[in-house]
Amino acid sequence: MPEVPETIVVTEEPIELPVAELLTGRGFITGKSGSGKSNTASVIAEELLEVGLPMLIVDTDGEYFGLQERYEILHTAVDDGADMLVDADDAERLAGLALDGNVPIILDLSGYVDPTEGTELITRVIREIFRMEDARRKPFLIIVEEIHEYLPEQGAHGEVGELLIQVAKRGRKRGLGLCGISQRPAAVDKNFITQCDWLVWHRLTWKNDTTVVRQLLGADSAASIQE
């Protein structure tokens, strides 16, 4: 196991986040399109990769491919160009690589024509990681882009959503952390957001989204993210 720092710096200000909370806690990053939310998530990933820590990134739009330019990270996808072509039957192998092989993995879903196939892959991989962590208890972070697609505020969660809720509620005891990312906090299940140990808010403009911030953090915070 590599030597792990107590904190990492994720912004220029700087803002520090405790590594232990990142790896085994629950976090949420939000902001309108172009506000920097995915960049913040990338910086978090880069800082953890810098010290040799593995993670799983659920990449819905192929945004994290650039991490390969600087780090040893396994890019998995359904189409050519990936390091490893995968489907749901590879779930146990991927979980083993991540936890036992200490391999950081990008689960790139951007090539799926049928989104249900991508959802099945996510579900099975995370389920395998959750199962294996019952014995291993190894600090490990799962980063999920567009988490509102799996944990919507309205409508059924589906199998993957229920699994993510389980990770959020019970993952810490197994060493599992979860970081959700969305440009629409109003569209994300508030039961998840309110359970988060850390929150990163970038600029938001839509009233429903700023209302969520006001409810959680107060009027001053809601005003500041509109500026």
Question: For each of these PLM feature ranges, what is it?
Answer:
Residues I15-V19, I44-R124:
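Switch/coupling segment of Walker-type NTPase motor domains
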Residues G27-F28, S33-S35, N39, E117-D220:
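Conserved P-loop NTPase motor cores
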Residues L22, Y112, L204:
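Hydrophobic pocket-lining residues within nucleotide cofactor-binding pockets
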Residues M1-H75, F130, G161, W201:
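Glycine-rich phosphate-binding loop of nucleotide-binding enzymes
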Residues G25, V103-I105, K138:
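Envelope-exposed proteins and targeting segments
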Residues Q226-E227:
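Conserved AAA+ ATPase small/helical "lid" subdomain
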